[in-house]
Amino acid sequence: MKEWPPNLAFHNKVIDGAAIKQLISRLIQRFGMLYTSHVLDQVKLLGFKQATASSISLGIDDLLTIPSKRWLVQDAQQQSFLLEKYYQYGNVHAVEKLRQSIEIWDAISAYLRQEMTPNFGMTDPLNPVHIMSFSGARGNASQVNQLIGMRGLMSDPLGQMIDLPIQSNLREGLSLTEYIISSYGARKGVVDTAIRTADAGYLTRRLVDVVQHIIVRGTDCGTTRGLSLSPQNGGVPESTQTLIGRVLAKDIYIGPRCIAVRNQDLGGGLVNRLITFKKKPIYVRTPFTCRSTSWICRFCYGRSPTSACGDLVELGEAVGIIAGQSIGEPGTQLTLRTFHTGGVFTGGTAEQVRAPFNGKIKFNEDLVHPTRTRHGQPAFLCYIDLYLTIESEDIIHSVPIPPKSFLLVQNDQYVESEQVIAEISAGTSTFAFKDRVRKHIYSDSSGEMHSNTGMYHARKFPFSNVHILPKTSHLWILLGDLCGSGPVLFSMYKDQDQMSIHSLSVQGRNTPSLSVNNDQLKHRRLSLYDKNGTGGGSIPILNYSEMTRSLSTARCNLLYPAILHENFSLLAKKRRTRFLIPFQSIQEHRRKNERILCSDISIKIPRNGLFRGNSILAYFDDPRYKIGVSGITKYGTIEVDSIVTKESFINYGGVQPKDEGKVDPLFFIPEEVHIFPETSSIMVRNNSIIGINTKITLNKRSRVGGLVRVKKIHRGIKLQIFSGDISFPRKRDKRFIPQNKDILIPPQIRKRNFNKSKKAKNWIYVQKMRPTNKNSFFLLQPVVTYEIADGINLARLFPPDLLQEIDNIQLRVGNYIRYGDGELIPGISGKNPRIQLVRTFLVLNWDQDKKDSSIEEAHASFVEVSTKGMVRDFLRIHLRKSQIAYAYMRKRNDPSGSGFPSDNELDHSNRNPFSSSYPKARVRQSLNGTIRTLLNRNKECQSLLILSSSNCFRLGPFNNVKYHNPKKESIKRDTDPLIPIRNFSGPLGTVPQIANFDVFYHLITKNRISVFHYLPPEKGKLQVIQSFLMDENGRIYKSDPYSNIFLNPFNFNWYFLQHNYHKNYPNYCEETSTIINLGQFLFETVCIAKNGPRLKSGQVFILQVGYVIIRSGKPYLAIPGATVHGHSGQIVYGGDTLVTFIYEKARSADITQGLPKVDAMFEVRSKNSISMRLKARDEYWNEYITRNLGIYWGLLIGAKLTIAQSSLSLVNEIQKVYRSQGVQIDNRHIELIVRQITSKVLISEDGMSNLFLPGELIGLLQAERTGRALEKGICYRAILVGITKASLNTQSFISEASFQQTARVLAKAALRGRIDWLKGLKENVVLGGMSPAGTGFRGLVHPSSKKYKTLSLETQRKILFDGKVRDLLFHHKRIV
């Protein structure tokens, strides 16, 4: 046997794809291309020989399922079942359920993927599937996991997750449902594949077009800048790929020895040595730092990507086109590869921290606060780095917890080994791809919607039925079957006739109460349309002060207005379902000759004339808050998130407002603001001071004098004139005025800081100004202060109620500011001479204090009544009410006669089927249950809400049930028994407020608490019974040190311990339970008694001594900010949208539809992704640095920093997308594209120059060189442009016209007289010339060298030329 050479190394390991790449690279560097190709041919033949000898084939018997899959899937199913139960109980909302479901199945799929390799290694190491999956030929671990593991969650073509997971694998076979879901992520025919391939091809075309002019035209540009790369920060493969092929920008020293010099290219051996040493950061040259504008040098680019010997790139190489094709071509291949990945969904899960052993948890409670996890579980959130200690008998272990992590255990809690104690959020990047997803929750069944908290109108939809939840609450759907009947015919009845449409008889009863006279009646329909026919106009109302009496009619439910009897006195009558507002009164013979003047009160009525609860009825514009000048509004404490900012409830009986709080004043800073078109000629300069009546344009003069600021806006120019005094700051002024902040100074503070000693009469607005190249100063502007009134007093509008009846209808009066804090009010034009700052609104509501209100909506109409020559117009609002008729359809032989349904009647099996087309007589015979009559959405039909046995259930009797036995426990009392009355928050926003005390000092709240002992009545002071909270283990919680009432916010069943202050029993406690109230909402998890029947979710419908009947309902947990499509008491149908959640969700990691992520980053237009975040970072840098360094230096440094930071961030994020799919792309290709995206700057309006226009896009290097040549700074801002916009803003209009918008580009080029110097490849190809690349580049170079070959250049001339260049670049005015 031949001996092995001693100097040849032998590597005894498996060679995979990565090792083969390294081997080929080393062979090329060591022996060259010819020898390497010979070696590779031998390797190929060896592979064919071994494959033929081994005969490896893939059969179905080789697919071995992982043994642990069965119990893992069962565990996941159990967790999903519990999660669904929590959702039905209302403990978690839909978004939390979705997140937890994703993490459950994703964790199972990841665990199976990890167990796959050890399973093959132990059971069958020579399995063909195991060998082929890691050979690098075809397939990967993810695809093998789908064969023998499970597919898990799938994503649709848009990247959204499908809720139903695929539990089977391809070896076991898929069911029909799983097969249909599985086909979503795969290729769906030729058309879909062609579309996605076309998208990838279009991306390649745009990438090539934006960099087609970048050609290697020089060896060294002379730059001294470079890119800092640290080998120890990233992984070894990433660092090696980033460094190989680069050129050093600085020398590298290891101690005193220089191992690499500047402009030396980095090979594989040198890079490995540098990574091994892990010394200081390495500075390499990059396309970002090349000083050329439209080309690149050899040293800044590095080695050629097409050269096998590792030489530097040749002159004339079209590296731009190579970069565009290198980035775009993998997109087409990845588009076709989506069939193999199958659209499997992958989402980032949180990292869990588990206890290493049994012990007790210790941590600092001051650094955490209670919260809910994204799964809806109670936890603690830590603010900063927290050290959690686990103490056992002999071991103390400390676990560091990073900020924004969740602690799932309590302090001093005993944990077991491997128990999850903390959850660390997934380390998502700042520029992680997230989508704002709207998830709609639909009703499963029909019924009534109720909410246990208040809702306010959405600002965008003031008249719609869309509401916003201010806090976490539950939405209840109380079940009920809807049975519709035929239309209600009112044509057989006359006006003012009484009829009962809620009667259960077949025929109605006609009982006229008022005779009809000969007075005229004119009824105006509510379908209001303006001149354009769009509808929804404003109806003016006359002054209410002329009216001294109001009018209403008796109780009826007609749809038409009433005719008033002549003897009917115009006094207040029953206003239970209707009321009328008089708004016009005039003699009939004067009606046609006189013109009625309208006040500022206007009514806003929806087009259909229907009002919901809390609907805005009317507006009133107070003339005190009208302004005729432009300016800025300022206020600090007034809430403007909702339309209602200050409100008071006022009944129509003349009750005065109560508990009116004081509102902070509204400040208005007058400023003259003008918006001119872009073509306007501005006759004043920016940052200049003008006087009154100064000509600012050809046909416009200023109304005030002051400082002028000119700013370019979108499609126009904004000109502001700031009136006031100017004060230059001193040192003490800088201490008095906060930096970078405008303030308001009250009149109590003297102006000694502004060179004046007299006392100010009004408020002063101080604003810091920074003009270009000048010192900063303070601008002192006068302020107009408005005190917002307390609203309209309705006592003078409506007379007192003589009958002293309680009204259902209520008005809510409030004020809201029409403009936001700091919002600029534009100039006042002739069409709109005055602007209203504060508007008073009137909100219509009814039955505010009643939980059992069944009124759904109010119908508005206008009535014109003529009595004895007097014409009166009324706005009539008719409440459409559905009365609850507790009439149960029972048989006549009911022996009990109690009026309640028996057990047989409430049984679902005894209920006969029914149809909605049955008449009322048939309904009466066939339905068993409570009938609630209500108006349908179609206002012509009636509906019956049937509360049958399927919607109600009975619990009882409770005769043999044992309640909780009282527990006695000694508690030390350290405080006085006098306990202050204090409101406290209960679970999920429920606020039980203390109402009053009875003679026994019994505490009454919304959730009534039964107590066994009362305080002795001889004490004269009111005292609250001291209560404690006991959990299921008998522990007593004390959460608030300033209150003696302790609640557990995560437990819905409240137990209280009550002190007994009797002399004989000074210190003992008793446990009590909650009493069920009529109308109370109960959850299924609540237990009211031991050994009692299990409750279902719903509302207590009937409450008796021996039993209780609960109407079934389903709770939906809603988070703050959720949109509710309806109001409390509204009838909903199955499938209706109840609530909409808005949350952020990470996109799927699988690339579909032709690289949408990469396309979004290159175009800089995607929402909630890196592009928008980079734009926000640019704006922040520009604003922050400008304030501290001034406009010129701030914009210059800010632009440099933002461009550099944005370039690096874009390169890293694009590489992440490609590396996630196993695609390796050289960083230099991406850097060339990103260089074009970040190479443009936007000329700023600050410091206008005669060379560029404000808002013009120019190159960064062009702006720098122009500023040096003119010896004057040019103000500009950094901007990110997409590849499409960058292709349309180049130096060649021929290249732009051949890309997009040909006619527009050529027309603009002709008008501007642009010159195309034909520097790029595309313009030369279009005109049929030779492209300046490759041999064409050499043809351009050689003639010039021959022409000047005979000229002798003197040394002095050369030095003089250097001096001129130095004079141009470094401001030298003389040659020395």
From Swiss-Prot:
Q: What is its main location?
A: plastid
Query: Which GO cellular component terms are attached?
Result: chloroplast; DNA-directed RNA polymerase complex; mitochondrion
Compartment(s): Plastid, Chloroplast
User: Could you tell me what reaction this enzyme catalyses?
Assistant: RNA(n) + a ribonucleoside 5'-triphosphate = RNA(n+1) + diphosphate
Q: Name one GO biological process term.
A: DNA-templated transcription
Q: Name one GO molecular function term.
A: DNA-directed RNA polymerase activity
| Alphabetical UniProt keywords | Chloroplast, DNA-directed RNA polymerase, Metal-binding, Nucleotidyltransferase, Plastid, Transcription, Transferase, Zinc
- Could you say which EC number(s) this protein's record lists? 2.7.7.6
The family database entries (InterPro entries) matched by this protein are listed as:
DNA-dir_RpoC2_beta_pp, RNA_pol_beta''_euk, RNA_pol_Rpb1_3_sf, RNA_pol_Rpb1_4, RNA_pol_Rpb1_5, Rpb1_funnel_sf
Record flagged with keyword Plastid:
yes
Could you say which residues bind Zn(2+) here? C221, C290, C297, C300
Could you tell me which residues belong to the region Disordered? 895-919
Pfam families hit by this protein: RNA_pol_Rpb1_4, RNA_pol_Rpb1_5
PANTHER family annotated for this entry? DNA-DIRECTED RNA POLYMERASE SUBUNIT BETA (PTHR34995:SF1)
Record's NCBIfam families? rpoC2_cyan
Cited function: DNA-dependent RNA polymerase catalyzes the transcription of DNA into RNA using the four ribonucleoside triphosphates as substrates.
Please give the name of this protein: DNA-directed RNA polymerase subunit beta''
Q: Which organism is it from?
A: Pelargonium hortorum
